[in-house]
C-alpha cells in the first residue's frame, strides 16, 4: 500500500495545496490500491478511470491558479444510488439502470470543490438491506462489510479513497462504518444535506452522509455537502456553519447522556465493555456524564418499519409489478410486505414518530450528546442471516443491526459512528447522537475522543496482499 493512500483527507489536501504531490499522482496511488484490493473486497460497481484522470489533470491546472479547498484534487467514491451525469445508476440491481442527464446538487458540490470522482460503489440492492452481499469486509473478507453503504465503507477502510458518500435510512452509513472501522455521519439534521438526485428507499427516513477515516475529514466533507437545494423539498434553507471552527475544543463543558434503557439491552458483552471503556475515558477527559431514560424507545423499530415498508413499496410499485423477477428474493419480499401496511397504520406511525421527536427533544434539554453502541453485535460471516444469543434466542441480522441505529432516522438527529475498539471476531464502535442543527458539537465531541485513542489509525492487515 502506498504511504500516500494511508494519509487522511486533511493530510493529502495539504500536500496538494503545497504542490508536494499532484492530483494525478494521488489518483494513480488510489487506482493502484483499488487494483490491489478489488478482488478481495469488490467495493465498486464501476471505476471511472478515464473520467477521473481527465478531472485530475484539469485539477492540477486549477490548483496552480486557485486552490478551491481541502477536497481539491482528492479522489472520492460515490454510492451507486447517487446520479452522475452520463453514468448508469444501477442501485446494484438489474431492475434499475438510469442514465442521469445532469449531476445532482450533491455531486455537483463535490465537483465544484475540486473532488475527483473515482467510481461508484456497491450498495445492498436499492439500499434495502444491511449486508451489501456483493462486497466484503477489508478487515476480514469472510465477513460482511455491512450495508447498505458497504462498498463505500469498504473502499475507505481499504485506503482506496479518502472519502465516500453514503445514504442512511435505518443505519446504512453507520452500520458499515462500524463494521469496517470508519467514521460515518448519518446526514446531519434532516434537510441539512440535500437529497435530490438519489434513488430513494423511504422519503421520510432517508439521510445522506459522508464516510471517512477521521472526524476532521468528516467535517471537511460535510462543509462541502451541506447547503440548500431548491430541487429537494426537504432541504433546509439555513446558514451552514464552519464545521472546522472550534472543532478541537475538547469535551469539557459538554453533557454526555448515557442511556439507562434500550441501548445496552441484549448486547454482546465485548461491545458493552468497549463502549463503557469509551465512556470512562471521556470522563477522564473532563466530560460530564448524565444518565438518561430514552423516551418511547420501544416504539423505535415499529415506527421505522411502519414508515419505511409502505414508502419503499410506493417507490417501487411500477417496477415491481412489471418485472418482479429482477429483484432479489429478500428485497422483493419486503416490497410485497409493504403493500400490506394500511394507510391508517402508516399515519399512526408518522404520528408516533412526531410524539417521539418531541419527547427526545425534551431529553436533549439535559444533555448535548448521547453515547451508545452503534451495533449490538459484530460483523457476521458472509451468508449468515441470523444471530444466536447465548440463551438460544435467534435474532434476524436485519433486526439486530438496525435495533440501535434506527433511533437516529426516526428522530432525525445527526448521528456519528466512531471507532472505539477491536475484538477477536469483529469491530466495536460507538455512536454519538446530537441535537438538531448542532452537528458542530457532535463532531467536536467525536474528535476529542478520537484524539485520545488510536483506533482510527489501524488499517486492515490483508489490504494490499494481492
Swiss-Prot record:
Region spans: Disordered: 128-152
EC number of this enzyme: 3.5.1.4
Record-annotated active site: 79, 148, 172
Keyword presence, Hydrolase: yes
Keyword annotations of the record: Hydrolase
Catalytic activity: a monocarboxylic acid amide + H2O = a monocarboxylate + NH4(+)
Cystine bridges: none
MF annotations from Gene Ontology: amidase activity
Pfam annotation, one family: Amidase
Similarity section: Belongs to the amidase family.
Protein name: Amidase
Organism: Pseudomonas putida (Arthrobacter siderocapsulatus)
Amino acid at each position: 500500500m502506498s504511504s500516500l493512500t494511508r494519509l487522511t483527507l486533511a493530510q493529502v489536501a495539504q500536500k496538494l495545496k503545497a504542490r508536494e504531490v499532484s492530483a494525478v499522482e494521488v489518483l494513480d496511488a488510489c487506482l493502484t490500491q483499488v487494483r490491489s484490493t478489488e478482488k478481495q473486497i469488490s467495493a465498486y460497481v464501476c471505476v471511472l478511470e478515464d473520467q477521473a484522470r481527465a478531472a485530475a489533470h484539469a485539477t492540477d491546472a486549477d490548483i496552480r491558479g486557485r486552490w478551491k479547498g481541502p477536497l481539491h484534487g482528492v479522489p472520492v467514491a460515490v454510492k451507486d444510488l447517487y446520479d452522475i451525469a452520463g453514468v448508469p445508476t444501477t442501485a446494484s440491481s438489474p431492475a434499475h439502470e438510469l442514465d442521469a442527464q445532469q449531476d445532482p446538487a450533491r455531486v455537483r458540490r463535490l465537483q465544484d470543490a475540486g473532488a475527483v470522482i473515482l467510481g461508484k460503489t456497491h450498495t445492498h440492492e436499492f439500499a434495502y438491506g444491511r449486508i451489501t452481499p456483493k462486497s466484503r469486509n477489508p478487515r476480514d473478507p469472510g465477513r460482511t462489510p455491512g450495508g447498505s453503504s458497504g462498498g463505500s465503507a469498504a473502499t475507505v477502510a481499504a485506503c482506496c479513497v479518502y472519502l465516500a458518500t453514503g445514504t442512511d435510512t435505518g443505519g446504512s452509513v453507520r452500520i458499515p462504518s462500524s463494521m469496517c472501522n470508519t467514521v460515518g455521519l448519518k446526514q446531519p439534521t434532516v434537510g441539512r444535506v440535500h437529497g435530490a438526485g438519489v434513488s430513494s428507499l423511504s422519503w421520510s427516513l432517508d439521510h445522506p452522509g459522508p464516510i471517512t477515516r477521521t472526524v476532521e475529514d468528516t467535517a471537511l466533507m460535510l462543509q462541502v455537502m451541506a447547503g440548500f437545494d431548491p430541487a429537494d423539498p426537504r432541504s433546509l434553507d439555513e446558514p451552514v456553519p464552519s464545521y472546522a471552527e472550534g472543532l478541537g475544543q475538547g469535551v469539557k463543558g459538554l453533557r454526555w447522556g448515557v442511556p439507562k434503557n434500550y441501548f445496552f439491552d441484549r448486547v454482546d458483552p465485548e461491545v458493552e465493555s468497549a463502549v463503557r471503556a469509551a465512556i470512562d475515558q471521556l470522563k477522564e477527559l473532563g466530560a460530564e456524564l448524565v444518565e438518561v431514560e430514552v423516551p418511547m424507545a420501544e416504539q423505535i423499530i415499529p415506527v421505522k418499519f411502519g414508515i419505511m415498508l409502505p414508502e419503499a413499496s410506493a417507490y417501487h410499485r411500477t417496477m415491481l409489478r412489471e418485472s418482479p423477477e429482477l429483484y432479489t428474493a429478500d428485497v422483493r419480499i419486503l416490497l410485497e410486505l409493504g403493500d400490506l401496511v394500511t394507510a391508517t397504520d402508516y399515519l399512526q406511525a408518522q404520528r408516533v414518530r412526531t410524539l417521539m421527536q418531541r419527547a427526545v427533544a425534551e431529553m436533549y434539554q439535559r444533555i448535548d450528546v448521547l453515547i451508545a453502541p452503534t451495533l449490538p453485535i459484530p460483523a457476521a460471516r458472509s451468508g449468515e442471516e441470523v444471530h444466536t444469543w447465548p440463551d438460544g434466542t435467534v435474532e434476524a441480522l436485519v433486526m439486530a443491526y438496525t435495533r440501535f441505529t434506527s433511533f437516529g432516522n426516526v428522530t432525525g438527529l445527526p448521528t456519528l459512528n466512531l471507532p472505539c475498539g477491536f475484538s477477536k471476531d469483529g469491530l466495536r464502535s460507538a455512536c454519538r447522537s446530537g441535537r438538531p442543527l448542532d452537528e458542530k458539537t457532535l463532531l467536536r465531541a467525536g474528535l476529542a475522543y478520537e484524539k485520545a485513542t488510536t483506533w482510527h489509525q489501524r488499517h486492515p492487515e490483508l489490504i494490499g496482499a494481492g
